[in-house]
């Protein structure tokens, strides 16, 4: 990494509003109807090293208006490691007083202790990966997530003062129907998120090995996917039920997302 960053100093452009993105990579072991995660403690050390290297190459402390923890499952690292990363970021860059700090959350592994860490780090926005509340769909995607886990995550977040909560749902998942999509969106809206985003599922088993466990015959076709997206939009947009963003897409379009 040091070699890759060598010579960057002369090319660093200090923008009036810089963004930072921190990706936490997670080794995930997927099995039929089950998944477990093993976290290498060196992950946070590697992120810290890269932060220090980038900061050292800048001609001056870069001003920061937005920080996003994503790309993996950032809240699965230890709370103390997250706080250490945030402390390093604040010491390495010039955070604006109005800086937005956003974190992606995995509800199944999110703890009250991690919520406390997010509050201490002054996190302002969170995004919860939900995908679907339908147990049949969850089983088909090997991602069983009880509604109680999502509810507990929201309660922990609101308890420590984080109210800007986004839900990520999906359509186009195996065994999904128009009815199950609308029911999942209804359940999500009932939890009062600040924003609801509905993405199209992208089935790319050649890229995502865990998707090879999915029964392709259970995937809705393009017409069915379109019906699902339209149904969610028509159900909520006319009623003004919060800010709902339905990102319609074909299976391999840029706005589609693979199952996490």
Curated annotation (Swiss-Prot):
Keywords from the UniProt entry: Oxidoreductase, Plasmid
A GO term from the CC aspect: cytoplasm
Enzyme Commission number(s) of this protein: 1.3.-.-
InterPro entries referenced in this protein's UniProt entry, alphabetically: Coproporphyrinogen-III_oxidase, Elp3/MiaA/NifB-like_rSAM, rSAM, rSAM_horseshoe
Domain of life, source organism: Bacteria
GO terms for MF: 4 iron, 4 sulfur cluster binding; coproporphyrinogen dehydrogenase activity
Location of the Radical SAM core domain: 6-239
Enzyme class at the top of the EC tree: oxidoreductase
BP GO terms, sorted: protoporphyrinogen IX biosynthetic process
Name of the protein in question: Uncharacterized protein y4hJ
